[in-house]
Amino acid sequence: MPKHMVKETREVIAIARKFNDEVAKPLALKLDRLTHEDVDYLPWELVEEANRWGFYTMWIPKMFGGQGYNIPSMSCFSEEVASACAGMMNVIGVHYLAVAGLIASGNARLAKRILREVVAGEKSGKPCVLALATTEPGAGTDVEESDLVDKGRITCQATRVENGYIINGTKVFISMGHVSSWTVLYAYEDTRHPSETTIGFVVKTGTKGFSFGSHENKMGQRVCPASVLIFEDCFIPDNLVLFSSGLVKKFTKSPVRDIAQRYIDYVVSATRPGVCAFGIGVARGAFEAALHYASSTEINGRLLINQEWVQCMLAEMHKNVILGRLAYTEANNANSHRGLYRLLQIKPVYYYLKAMPRFWFDKVIAPVLDWEFTSRLMGKLYFDLPKPEDQRCCSGWASVAKFAGTDLGVKNCQMAIEIMGQKGLRQDAGVEKMLRDIKLLQIYEGTNQLNRLNAFKCLIAPEVPQAKVFDE
């Protein structure tokens, strides 16, 4: 690992703590109350504030116009901000789920186009936020596994027409849908065999035939809207097709089903460690709240912090934070050596990207990204050259981190409420909000049950020839 990454990560943590002090902590409970009073509230002011801080370009690689901070540092940032408010962190973090979807496709031309719009939005003060749409009314976790998607009730269909596709269907629970400028959308040519006909698109908000329904009245992370996206005879031209069997065949002979799974794995292997970091941030926030309460509250003339049962619970909570942090660090380490951003962290490449001035990327590198050869090369590097064991390592560790970190976060919130008693149930104490926020983390990015099965599939089953996964 390049040594400068450590310095860079410390810088990111310092920025996150400053943001917490100035924005997240003062607003967390206020915005939560506001969303209960006004269920149609959309966080435009928060999005604009995050844009002013540069958060929507911070982890976009410099070749695409972004600031180019190392990707693992985002997990540290996520932990910090989520310790104050997981919903606010999702307003920032879900944008990078779509960024991962763009880059993992290997479609350099389209990734450059969209990501440079994000950069332009930062400069102009008009945020260009991205969303990613996979979940459907009858298919959620199913769509993240090729072995399961054919069993789901898939309805979002892409029909081939001259010069593009017509999209019909609905996506649900799409984080930041209502406030996004572009959506990375996955649809299927044959809804009976979706695993072999996956197509990725980018759709601009306002496109004819694309509209928003309601956004969910959620239990937690209320400041981050979860939207219904409706597509009714929505035409998407060929130049906005991100991923398809036709594009895949240009750089690999592997079956489309396998390539689609590898594409999905690249995305979630990069983002699930971040969800773990969200969970550990909430776990840490709950620990800090319980510690403060125990240090300042007397029972029968004796500080709560001096009672052994409280000391044991606080030690357990602290242990949970440490273990979760190790889990997302290990998952990020796997990605750094074998996953989506491995090339960016090879020492010569990393220092080259740091040393080159902005104009070099704008004048020299940016035009190269429009070449078809560049997209073919990226496709080859992502989909044809990596070994299956690399994919299993990254995907397996990402799943372990995801379910470990989020489960530990739930435990810490429950323990904090036990320590704080009735005080922990009060809205102004903040811990009941943390418990509402953390529950969602066990569900999105693949339920924790699915992630346990994926961890078994990737890390255990290869050593047991008779083991079968997703066979029921």
PLM features per residue range, with description:
Residues 125-140:
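A short, Trp-centered hydrophobic/proline-enriched beta-strand micro-motif
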Residues 383-389, 412, 418-472:
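Glycine-rich phosphate/cofactor-binding loops in nucleotide/flavin-utilizing enzymes
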Residues 156-159:
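A structural signal for short hydrophobic beta-strand segments in well-ordered beta-sheet cores
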Residues 3-7, 11-12, 212-325, 441, ...:
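Glycine-rich beta->alpha junctions and the first turn(s) of the following alpha-helix
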Residues 1-93, 113, 117, 340-347, ...:
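Amphipathic, small/basic residue-rich leader segments at the start of a protein or domain
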Residues 90-116, 140-143:
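N-terminal glycine-rich flavin-associated loop
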Residues 3-4, 30-41, 252-274, 287-320, ...:
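Glycine-rich cofactor-pocket loops
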Residues 168-212:
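A short core secondary-structure module
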